[in-house]
């Protein structure tokens, strides 16, 4: 079936190996040593969802508040820029945080609904469940006998069967219990930190036009660095292609931020050409 030297394996052996995280058959001593050394040398990795939320929050924070502060600077009053910018920062951070929380809660609810439907399917339709298991193994062109035995083992273990269907058929992973709050806080902080950077010159310089120039210079550098880092986090840091892609990502962020700021300034000047008080 699976080779002569494995013909003495019992169903219990197959069941244990089916859920082994690193392979179907027991590793050799050399493989075990290599696996142990690779695991011990692996550094802890940041949750990809946290990285994604941080990038999203910073990306919006570096663009929208900068465009708003640049537009408000056309009014010629640094106090208006600071107050309006801070108000937008707080409102935007709260909005981003709530959006992240609601989105994560929706993922949890979707996962729980999938779990309920799968449990009902297992209890109500044994034959359909067995067919689904065979569908999962079908792309691998495995012999029928081991697939049938594995299906039987899975069906006799409800918890493992549920986990198998969720992972390999529905392709769903259980969300973290605190993921909604972590996502909300990460998005809100990313937005606030990113949006506060272009406001810094307005706290230090009294002349609005000078502060605007400082803000533009700071944001060009910040957007360039952020775009480069954001791209290289996804693609990698080494290699000519990755470096070129990182530079392109930085330039794209500068172009997007510049267009948003330019549109905001143009709109403010169109509404208030003199730069005086509106009311």
UniProtKB/Swiss-Prot annotation:
Main location: membrane
Record flagged with keyword Membrane: yes
Localization per record: Vacuole membrane
Membrane topology (UniProt): Multi-pass membrane protein
Disordered: region residues: 1-44
Pfam families: VIT1
Any one Gene Ontology cellular component term annotated for this protein: vacuolar membrane
Family recorded in the similarity comment: Belongs to the CCC1 family.
Induction: Expression is repressed in iron starvation conditions and induced in high iron conditions and is controlled by the hapX and sreA iron acquisition regulators.
Residue spans crossing the bilayer: 55-75, 80-100, 185-205, 208-228, 243-263
Species in which this protein is naturally found: Arthroderma benhamiae (strain ATCC MYA-4681 / CBS 112371) (Trichophyton mentagrophytes)
PANTHER family: FE(2+)/MN(2+) TRANSPORTER PCL1
Tree of life domain: Eukaryota
Annotated gene: cccA
Protein name, per record: Vacuolar iron transporter cccA
């Amino acid at each position: 079936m699976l080779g002569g030297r494995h013909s003495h394996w019992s169903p219990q052996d197959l069941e244990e190996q089916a859920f082994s995280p690193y392979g179907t058959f027991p590793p050799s001593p050399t493989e075990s040593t290599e696996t142990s050394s690779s695991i011990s040398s692996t550094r802890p990795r940041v949750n990809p969802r946290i990285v994604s939320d941080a990038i999203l929050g910073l990306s919006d924070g570096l663009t929208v508040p900068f465009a708003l502060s640049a537009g408000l600077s056309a009014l010629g009053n640094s106090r208006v820029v600071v107050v309006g910018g801070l108000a937008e920062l707080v409102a935007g951070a709260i909005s981003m945080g709530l959006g992240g929380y609601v989105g994560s809660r929706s993922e949890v609810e979707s996962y729980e609904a999938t779990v309920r439907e799968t449990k009902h399917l297992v209890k109500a339709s044994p034959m359909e469940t067995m067919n689904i298991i065979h569908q999962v193994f079908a792309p691998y062109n495995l012999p029928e006998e081991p697939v049938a035995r594995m299906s039987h083992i899975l069906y006799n273990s409800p918890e493992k069967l549920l986990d198998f269907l969720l992972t390999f058929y529905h392709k769903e992973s259980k969300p973290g219990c605190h993921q909604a709050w972590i996502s909300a806080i990460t998005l809100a902080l990313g937005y606030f930190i990113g949006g506060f950077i272009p406001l810094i010159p307005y706290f230090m310089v009294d002349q609005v036009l000078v502060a605007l120039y400082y803000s533009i210079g700071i944001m060009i550098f910040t957007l360039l660095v952020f775009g480069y880092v954001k791209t290289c986090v996804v693609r990698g840091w080494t290699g000519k292609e990755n470096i070129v892609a990182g530079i392109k990502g930085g330039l794209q962020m500068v172009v997007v931020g510049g267009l948003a700021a330019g549109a905001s300034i143009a709109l403010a000047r169109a509404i208030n050409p003199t730069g005086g008080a509106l009311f």
